[in-house]
Curated annotation (Swiss-Prot):
GO terms for biological process: glycerophospholipid metabolic process; phospholipid biosynthetic process. It comes from Saccharolobus solfataricus (strain ATCC 35092 / DSM 1617 / JCM 11322 / P2) (Sulfolobus solfataricus). Pathway: Membrane lipid metabolism; glycerophospholipid metabolism. Zn(2+) binds at D171, H251, H267. It is an enzyme of class 1 (oxidoreductase). HAMAP family: G1P_dehydrogenase_A. One of its GO terms (molecular function) is metal ion binding. This is Glycerol-1-phosphate dehydrogenase [NAD(P)+]. Substrate binds at D124, D171, H255. Its main location: cytoplasm. Its EC number is 1.1.1.261.
Length: 351
């Protein structure tokens, strides 16, 4: 790779354990961060977690809270208004993917550090220096700030809705496809391929695959395994300086569906469906992936997510246009309507 400089953006510390939010003041002391803090959180369950974090901040710490319920540019602007007013030294993102995406993007735009405190293991954005923000030109990830630290409290994460946990598994297993697509682009287009970062992403996928054997028996152990996989995937992106190790044709399909059917479906759920479909195209055993996901209660049919056959087929035909510079198994021309329909039926995504 003939570039003058390659910057690797990684978290300084990762704290994983049980009931560790009660030790947040100790962690902040270790990190050398001081008030004032700006806390970004959700409006419902995550706000309760944020309140617990606030109770354990350093004594007399000055802070302000912003509550959001989406990840749009308007939400980012709302956070930035408070940044201008209180000049915080640190942002804390306490919530799910939307909260953390808004926090890291606002931190990036304002040259601030941020700490990621996820309340659900729904996708690998808890670690990565990229964010998905609605209101931009396309539904793809944009450059954002990597977290200074991650505080992953397994007690909190294991209480998140099972649907969110399953979505995290779907998102992470998708790295199997992303790495295959990356290899294909290197072979056919001469694109740079990073063996180490690809191996790290693939290891994350395999770890999540193993998680499907455990999660029904031991939720806390399974969630810890999943968190390790999500963190590793985010680190792979930070090392690569792009989302390439973690986002391929399975994500293009997910983004295409999000354009057609923008509400009510979790990102990781769509990535899981996309992984089954793209595994078929790559000649990978898609049946094993489908069966493993089905056993944990993952929705493996489009209708389970409220998607029509036509929406799935259309998404498959336009997926290659979402990010044309990123070569995948879909090629430059994508799939015809008839071939997309055939593949969706063969993989049992549609009946």
């Amino acid at each position: 790779m003939n570039v003058k400089e390659h910057v690797i953006s990684l978290p300084r510390r990762v704290f994983v354990g049980h009931d560790i939010v009660y030790d947040i003041s100790i962690y902040f002391s270790q990190l050398g961060v001081t008030p004032p803090f700006l806390i970004v959180t959700g409006t419902k369950y995550t706000k309760k977690i944020a309140d617990k974090v606030i109770e354990n901040l350093p004594k007399d710490a000055k802070y302000e809270v912003v509550e959001i319920d989406s990840a749009t540019l308007d939400d980012v602007y709302m956070v930035e208004e408070v940044i201008k007013r209180i000049s915080p030294s640190l942002l804390l993102g306490i919530g799910g993917g939307k909260v953390i995406d808004v926090t890291k993007y606002a931190a990036f735009r304002n040259s601030l550090e941020f700490v990621s405190i996820p309340t659900s293991p729904s996708h690998d954005g808890i670690t990565s220096p990229f964010a998905s923000i609605k209101g931009l030109q396309k539904p793809v990830s944009v450059k954002a700030k990597e977290p200074l630290a991650i505080i992953a409290d397994i007690e909190i994460l294991s209480l998140s809705p099972r649907r969110l946990i399953n979505a995290g598994i779907g998102d992470t297993i998708g790295k199997i496809i992303a790495v295959r697509d990356w290899k294909l682009a290197a072979k056919l287009r001469g694109e740079y391929y990073g063996d180490y970062t690809a191996s790290l992403a693939l290891m994350s996928a395999k770890h999540a695959f193993q998680c499907t054997k455990i999660i029904n028996k031991d939720i806390k152990y399974g969630v810890r395994m999943l968190m390790e996989a999500l963190i590793s995937s985010g680190v792979a992106m930070g090392m690569a300086g792009s989302t390439r190790p973690a986002s391929g044709s399975e994500h293009l399909f997910a983004h295409a569906v999000e354009l057609i059917h923008p509400e009510g479906i979790l990102h990781g759920e769509l990535v899981g469906l996309g992984t089954i479909i793209m595994a078929y195209l790559h000649g990978i055993n898609w049946k094993i992936i489908r069966n493993r996901l089905k056993k944990i209660g993952f929705p493996v049919k489009a209708k389970d997510l409220g998607l029509s056959d036509e929406e799935v087929i259309k998404a498959l035909t336009i997926a290659h246009t979402i990010r044309p510079e990123r070569y995948t198994i879909l090629g430059d021309r994508g799939l015809t309507w008839s071939s997309a329909e055939k593949i969706a039926r063969v993989t049992k995504i549609i009946d």
